[in-house]
Structure formats: structure tokens, C-alpha cells
Amino acid sequence: LLPLGFLFAWLYHGSVILIPLTILYALSCLVTEKRLIWKPIAYACAGLALGFLINPYFPDSLRFLARHLPDVAGSGTGVPPSAEWFSYASWDLFQTTRGAWLLLLAGILIMTFYRLGLTRRTLFHFLACCMMLVLFLRARRFVEYWPLFVALFSASVIHEASGEVISSIKRLANPAEIQKRRLIWFAFLSGLFVVLVAASAVNAVRTGLEISQNAPADRFVNASVWLKANTPRHSVVYNSQWDTFPDLFFHNHHNLWVAGLNANFTYFIEPRLWLLYKNVS
């Protein structure tokens, strides 16, 4: 964990998430094995500290982290947060990660069906999954975290139940059993095929409709041409909308672009320019 924490601090500014994960691991050991461990937490903290201190961007690496923490905590700094720091509507929480919800349900059902006890690994993955779900409920930027830990939890459950699952499959796949229940198997497989085909068709139609409703690719052509004609080469265009940057950049390599920065970072770097942008937009 020491070298991992060091590399994590260099590669990802949200690397401090390693600390609560190691705490959850220690809690899992305490609950399942009745022993208290502290070394993983200490090594993770030491690795992260070294990574932030022995860093080509030091001390900006620490300032960058400090400016991000208010967004995570939800306290704010008076600057309107970026869209990624808003939470999804309740139904969107399911729509965006419905596969993860189904996978979580499958993991819980497998545990219940086979009456599995919680091992250290399974409990850790479950606690980490719960933590990531809370972060996901907090802000949409954590949408990529939670499904990954759901997959880890479900994989851990399947691993624990692998012996029982294999026995069940062998029993169901026995030729005598298949012959006895051939009508049930035929109905099940036919129904599964129909459901999969219908779901694929609905998804294809929905995707086509969404693509047709996208903004036209040439929506910023006139603005790009105007900037080329009326601004010096390599002059900076201040644009905080990351989703409009590809369209602008595609039509204009004449200018330099400031795009996609979190509003807090933009404000700290150049407060007057950010306030001007806010007033103009």
C-alpha cells in the first residue's frame, strides 16, 4: 500500500479515497476475524503523504486537493459548482446504473439462497460498495465508482458460492433432469431469447432517437469563423463548458482554449476573469 499510495497520489487527485477504503478493510477484519489491524491504514496514509509531498507540482498538489474537498463535502465556497457535483434525480439513479442495481440484487440473492456467511473479503466489498453508493447519491461524478464496486462485491459472493453453484448447475444439466423437464427448459430458453431480442430492439430504437436529437455538429461554425477573423493567433478563448469544446476546437485551431475547468479552480486561478465570464454568460 505504500508504493500504491505514492503512485495513486501522482496519478489521480482523488487518491485520498484510499484512506476510507483501508479503514473499511480494517473494520471488516475486526468484524469477521475479531482482530484489529492498523498497518494498511498507516501504509496508505504514508504513501499518499509522500506522493503529495515528493511531487513535481508541490505545493500546488496540496492546494489542488484542498480546493476539491469542499465540493466533496458539499460545503461549497460560494462559487456555483460544476454540473458533475449535482446529484441525479431519483429515477435517473436507477436508469444510469440499472445493470449495477441488478448485479447487486443478484449478489444478495445468491448469499441468501446459499446461506453464505460474510467473509472478510465479501464484507469489505459490501462496505466499499455502500460507501461508493453514498458518494454516487452525493454527486454524479461518482457514477463510475459505484458499479465497479458492485461488480467486485458480486464477484466475491459468486466466488464464495462457487462450489454450491457448480453443484446446482451439474444437477440441472444432468441429461435425465433435462429430459424430464424439457418443456420447462424449452419455455425458459424461448422466453429468455424473446426478452433479450426485445430489449435489444428497444435499446437500438432509443439510441437512434437520442442521436437524432443531438445538437447539430455545425452549431459553432459561425462563432469559430468570427474568432479566426477577429482575434490574434493563439489568443485565449475562455470557455468553461467542456461539452462544447470539441465542437469549437474542431472548427478552430487558430485560438487556444480554456475549457472544462471546475468553476472553483477557475475562480482561484483568475477571480476577475471568472467573474467577467459569469457576468457575460
Range-by-range predicted roles:
Residues 1-13, 22, 47-52, 130-136:
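Membrane-interface alpha helices of multi-pass inner-membrane proteins
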Residues 17, 135-174:
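Hydrophobic/aromatic-rich transmembrane helices and adjacent perimembrane loops
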Residues 18-46, 160:
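Perimembrane helix-loop-helix junctions
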Residues 32, 36-40, 161-185:
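Membrane-interfacial, low-structure loops and terminal tails that flank and connect transmembrane helices
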Residues 32-42, 96-97, 107-128:
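Membrane-interface helix-loop-helix junctions at transmembrane boundaries of multi-pass membrane enzymes
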Residues 45-65:
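Membrane-lumen/periplasm interface segments of specific transmembrane helices
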Residues 63-103:
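Juxtamembrane membrane-water interface segments that cap and precede transmembrane helices
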Residues 170-232, 242-245, 263-265, 269-281:
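Membrane-proximal, lumen/periplasm-facing interface regions of secretory-pathway glyco-
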